[in-house]
Every structure is written in C-alpha cells, then in structure tokens.
C-alpha cells in the first residue's frame, strides 16, 4: 500500500535541506501494509473514479486522506445538518457545518504542521521524466513495478473518449498530450496493442489521424529530438548564445519571466549540444508508430512551423517565424562550424551550464518546477553522467510524485505553503481557537519555519536573480523561489498569529523577519501599482511577440496579477495597523497604488480576469477583498459596485456560482455546462460579496449561497470534489485538491462572522 511520508530526507547522501525538510512530502510503497479494510477502501476509490472519469476529471485525492484519517482514528461527532426548502439558514446550522468541516480537515494536518494535497493536472509532466530516466539508464532504479502500475493507471484513467490525451486533464485531446503519453506507455513496457481499454492503439490512431508526431508543438519537438524520434533540424533554433548577449538588450534571458528563462536555459544547452540518446530497438519501433511516413523520408525543415490545430492556442506571429528562419538559415550554420563552434558555441554552453548549476543549488535540486527540473537534470547528465550534480537531481525526483485513486502523477512542485496559509486564515476566521489550539500552533510553527531566510547565494544579481530573504515560496523553504502572493499570505498569517496568546499558538515571528517580508513586497510592486508573481515586471510588452510556445500566452516576460496585488494590499494594510511607523510612507503609497491598479484593470462588465484560478469568479473575490482592505466600499467606489453587480448577475438558481475553465482561454465568462454550481467558486463569490458589504444591503444572495454549501457537505465533514479550480497562463488547468475543503470552510466562517447573526435569515440560538 502507498504511504505518504512527511518531512523525511531519508539516507540518500546527495540530498540536503535548509530547514530539516519541513513541508517535504514523498510517497513510498509499503509492501507490509496490507490492512484488508484499507485496501478495500482504496480499490473502491479507484473503481469509483474510473466509473466517473469522464464526468469529474480531478481526483478526490483520497489515498493519503484515508491513511491520515485511519492513523488519527478520526470520527465525525457532529451530526450532519441540512437546510430544507423554504427553511432559513439558522445560526446552529451554519455553526454545525463549519465545525464539522474544521474538525474533519484539521484531522488531515501533517506532523510538521502543513496540509498535504495534490497539485497536478497537466498531462505533460510525467513523460519527460520517464524519457529522461530511460535515457540516463535509471528508469528501473526510480520506477519500481508499483510506480509503473500507478503511472499507467493515471494515463489510462485520463485518456479521452476519442483515444487522445489533453494538454491537461480537463482539456480536449492534443498532439502534445497524446504523443507524450503514448511514448510514456511504451517506455513503461506496454506493447503496440497493449494498455487498458486498448489505450495504446487508440492513442496511436488519434496521432496518425491528426497528422502524426511531426505536428507536435515546439516543446514536443524538442523532447522527440532528444529521444531520436525527430531530427533536431525539425526544431526552431534555441541558441545558447543568448546567454552571452549584453544584459541590457531587450531580448536577453534576464528580461524573461523566470519560468520561461528556466525552461529555455537547459533546452538551449541540449539544443546547442544537439544531444540525442542512443537509438534502441524500441526507439526504432516508435519511429514507425508515431509518423505518417518513413522516418528517413521526412523533410524536417518543412515541419519546424507545423503545429496541430488542436494544440494551437497562441499562433506564432509572422515576425517570430521570420526570426526563427533567419537564425535557422544563417546563424546556426555558422555557430556549429569551425571556428565559431569553438570560439562562441562552447563558451555559450559553459555559461549556460553555470546558470543551470546555480539554479539547481539554490533550489536544493528541486528546481523551479516540473518541466524545468527534468530538463536541468538531463543537462547535468549530458555534461557528466557520473557527476554529483546528476546524483543530487535523482535524490529529489521523489519530491514530484503524487499518488491518488487515479494513479501516480507529477506535481507542479507542490502547494504546501499556499494551501496551509489559506486554511490557517479559514481556521482563524472560524473563531474556534479553543477547539483547535494544537492545530493552530503546529500550523504557525510550519509557516515560520517555511519562510525563506536568505537571498540566493553569491552575487545573485549577476545570475539574474532577485531578493528572496523574507519571502515564502509556493511549496517549502528548500524550493527557494519567492512569490509575492505566497509571501503576502504568509505575512498575513504571522501577523494574525501575533495577535493571539503565545501559550496558545506559539511565539510570534520576530518583527525583523516581518520587515524582511514587507521589504520583498515593496521591492516587487510595479509602477502601475500592480504586483508581479516572482520578479519585478516592466519589460517591453512587445517581447511577447517572441513567445515560442503554441499553447501558453504571456509567458515571455513577467506581468502583474490581480491576485498578487490583492494579497499584498491586504497584508500591508494589516501590517500598517500593527507596525504603523515602519516605512510608513512607502507602505501607504503601496496600498494606494495597489488599490488603484485593482480599479484600473477591471473589465467593462465589472469582472476581473483571474490568472491562477477559474476565472472571473476567482478574480472578483481577490479584487473585492483587496479593495475592501484598502478602504474602498460599495458607496465610495464604482469598481466595487460593478464587481458586486457582476457576481450577483451570474448567481445561479440554487444559490451557487459555476464557471467553466473555458473562461480562461476564451477570456470571457463561460458558465459550467447545464448551469451547474461549483462549491469552490461559490465560496469565492460568497466571500467577495461579504467583503463588499452585501450583508448590509441585501443578505438574501449570501444566505442562498451558504445554504448550498451547508447542504452539499458530506457525512464526514468533507465536501465533494467537482470541476478543477486552478489554472496557469490562461490555457492549462491545475488541480488544487485542498480547495474543496479550504474555501467552503472559509466562506462559512466569514458568513457566520459577518452576516449579522441577529438578522431574520440567520439568528443566534435561543437561550
């Protein structure tokens, strides 16, 4: 049976940590764990997911939950409540539902204080890792038979009905998703006609029916070239010489969004080396299976710009293709021949590897994300197959695995801090401190231990990095990459804890470390008042014309986001109340400019585009709460009025809200099919309206939403998993499995606190 291990480093001599592995979560298969009741529950969960896989795509993340609830012998002692038709929401009902949710999810807290959860969904994370391990000869070392079984399960369970696989689990079939998962199945031992429900042959048919693997997007062409399944001449150039350009040039990698920079750094190294793995009999078979014509007859030059229409979200501008053609026809032939291959190319490759090693070391070999991790690991192996750099990479591979009832998948890199900071705020809003003292104290300790204590090593600015001391990451401290919203949410938690008795929640974070966090936030704010995610924004927008991907938008440079801006405004408003003299003018200016940014980016219909959640509902919650924190109200701010009207206009008959992920790529509000409600989105809308003062005007929409949340709660205090709620870069969904608990609990807590308990619809219990 699979078991989730918390804050363990194991005995691997090549792994190291900055905080004793707080937040680390790894899965191990325990052959001795054979409890028949637990095994039966796991098998039932798998079967239930399989039977409903085309209706509810994200997992309910049940394996670790079953484990933790069993280990803690959790029993729900508060009776389930329902609000009947025509009945008003009572104080007792709201309180009971809230307490049931809090007790249930508190029981799922890990030993180090964080809340584990799946954070996955893209269908292009696992295959590159499998290819990398196949190339390096470590596939059988890392992938046990149990790893193979669960990885294949995930692929089978997320195959679309037409035989293909999507860019992400909610999406239509794409060439990128289908080719990568096809290769993954074959490398893991499936034959050409193998796989559950004829998965392999159905996938191959989809590929060939849609033009074959030469129509895969550019990232796919790179991996196929590495695998010997395409020729490098079928790829657009990724010259490592970009790293030799003067940093003041607009197209220098230093100007890129960090994820873009971190993807093309190892890609450019592998391209510059023209690395291709040893051609095995299996690769020769795959050449025959994936292409519509014999491999040696393919005109690779003609397929460089070919991309399957199902994959194309961001078509390349003509200008970009002209640039690639110029590099392809003139620059690359020169740089790959003597003497420039010695004078320039080798120097560029060394410079690129210097940056790779720097980034690896400063993330403890976790690297910034799943895509980048595998590319950097392969680059280290290509440089030195027996070197310590590669061995350190191998030691951190388990950090990316996640196992649920739908199988094994690769996480983005983990949402440990993000989920924990949100749930802490939900707990504090519940006003249940006396019942959850231990839970709060452990969470407080985890958040304090997860703060980044130092900037990147050495002369970090010369490595195109920025300050991180005082920040929080998305996952854990070892990851190292600062994030503005994660920093703001962590700061909010620490400030709220500082208002509580230390004998209850532990010692408050020292003011100096709070000041470090404030420094990060002040450093990152843009001139327009908005907040970027990772690094300062402000580079020229025209650089987005050079976006080399076909399936993402706005990935070349850093941008400002409504969510990051709101989180930072909320955090600094609270900080200003508690530390009114610290950098007072800067903090006040930040809040003023941040609020103005939130007003300025509002859409004409009153909505805000959410960048990291689905979508306009998510953006509206953040914007309205941020504006409220800055002193903007329904009466004094037109943006608040328009935002409230937007949410009220899309409320559904059952009192909920339900928005399709399709809103994200379409950039317009798209309701869920059949006007279904989604509990997570209902919670966002409910909180947004409450912070906008809706309870003082007409609480009826709030009571209707609360009724839906209360009536949807399950018998044990959990909430049902519904449609995916997370997204990134407009076109790829991301499953935050913790959201289905965090946000309904938080919304009920805020509802109970701010919807006047003496009103007609929600009343205090009679004495």
Swiss-Prot record:
GO cellular component, one term: lipid droplet
Top-level taxon: Eukaryota
Gene3D superfamilies, A to Z: 1.50.10.20
EC nos: 5.4.99.50
UniProt-listed GO biological process terms: triterpenoid biosynthetic process
Molecular function via GO: beta-amyrin synthase activity; intramolecular transferase activity
PROSITE patterns: TERPENE_SYNTHASES (PS01074)
Tissue: Expressed only in the epidermal cells on both sides of the leaf and not in internal leaf tissues.
Broad enzyme group: isomerase
Primary role: Oxidosqualene cyclase that generates friedelin, a triterpenoid product with the maximum number of rearrangements possible. Friedelin is probably required to coat the leaf exterior as defense compound against pathogens or herbivores.
Family note: Belongs to the terpene cyclase/mutase family.
Name assigned to this protein: Friedelin synthase
Species of the source: Kalanchoe daigremontiana (Devil's backbone)
